[in-house]
Regions:
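Transmembrane alpha-helical insertion/packing segments
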Residues: 2-80
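Individual transmembrane alpha-helix segments
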Residues: 156-179
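Alpha-helical transmembrane segments of multipass membrane proteins
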Residues: 26-34, 64-68, 107-115, 180, ...
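C-terminal halves and exits of single transmembrane alpha-helices
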Residues: 96-119
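Low-complexity, acidic polar-rich segments
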Residues: 141-159
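Functional transmembrane-helix hotspots
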Residues: 112-143
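Short, charged juxtamembrane terminal tails flanking transmembrane helices
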Residues: 10-13, 190-197
Length: 197
C-alpha cells in the first residue's frame, strides 16, 4: 500500500509539473511573440504595446491559468476516482487545492522570473516603451489639466528612470498573483473534491 501511495503522488507530481511547464512556455511564447512583433513593426506605438500587454494579461492569461489549473485537477481527480475503492481514497479538498495552486504557482514563478530577468538585462528599451505607453494611456484618459501634469512628469528623470521590473515590483505582482491562484484553486478544489465519475 505504501508503494501504491508513493506512485500516485509521483504521477500527480508529474502531471502538475508537465502542466506547469507547458503553461510557462505558452506564457513566454505570448510575451516574446508580442515583444518581437513590437520590435520589428514600426507601426506599433508604445501606447499600443502597453495596451496589447494588458489585453494579453487580462483576457488571455487569466483564463489560461484557470483552465490549466482546472484541467490538471480534473485529470488527477478522474484518475483517483478510477482506482479508488473507498470514499476516503477520492481526491480531497486539500489535495485538489495543492494541485491547482502548484500548477499555477510553478508556471507563474517561472514565467514571471524570466520576464523580469529579460526586462532587467536586454529589454530595457521595451521597459521604456511600456513606461511611455502607461503615461500615454493615462494622458489619453484624463482631462487636459491633468494631462499637462503627467506630461511634465516625463521630464523628471527620477520618474522616467523608475525600474518597473525591480524586486519590489516582482514580489508585489507575485503577491497579487498568489491571491488569484489561491482563490481559483479553492473554487476548483471545492468543486472537484470527492467526485466520482
Amino acid at each position: 500500500m505504501l508503494g501504491y501511495s508513493y506512485l500516485c503522488r509521483m504521477n500527480t507530481f508529474n502531471k502538475v509539473l508537465r502542466s506547469s511547464l507547458l503553461l510557462a512556455v505558452i506564457v513566454l511564447v505570448l510575451f516574446f511573440g508580442l515583444y518581437i512583433a513590437y520590435s520589428t513593426n514600426a507601426q506599433i506605438q508604445p501606447k499600443d504595446y502597453y495596451k496589447y500587454t494588458m489585453i494579453i494579461c487580462c483576457f488571455i492569461l487569466v483564463p489560461l491559468f484557470a483552465g490549466f489549473s482546472f484541467f490538471t485537477t480534473l485529470s488527477v481527480s478522474r484518475a483517483k476516482a478510477k482506482i479508488a475503492t473507498t470514499y476516503e481514497e477520492l481526491l480531497t479538498f486539500k489535495d485538489a487545492f495543492k494541485i491547482g495552486f502548484y500548477t499555477m504557482f510553478i508556471a507563474g514563478v517561472i514565467s514571471l522570473a524570466v520576464i523580469f530577468i529579460f526586462f532587467n538585462t536586454s529589454g530595457e528599451w521595451a521597459q521604456d516603451a511600456l513606461r511611455n505607453g502607461i503615461l500615454d494611456t493615462f494622458m489619453g484618459n484624463m482631462d487636459a489639466e491633468q494631462a499637462k501634469v503627467i506630461e511634465q512628469s516625463r521630464k523628471e528623470p527620477e520618474i522616467m528612470k523608475v525600474n518597473l521590473f525591480s524586486f519590489k515590483y516582482f514580489f508585489g505582482l507575485l503577491s497579487m498573483f498568489l491571491s488569484f491562484y489561491m482563490a481559483v484553486s479553492a473554487i476548483f478544489a471545492q468543486f472537484l473534491k470527492k467526485r466520482v465519475y
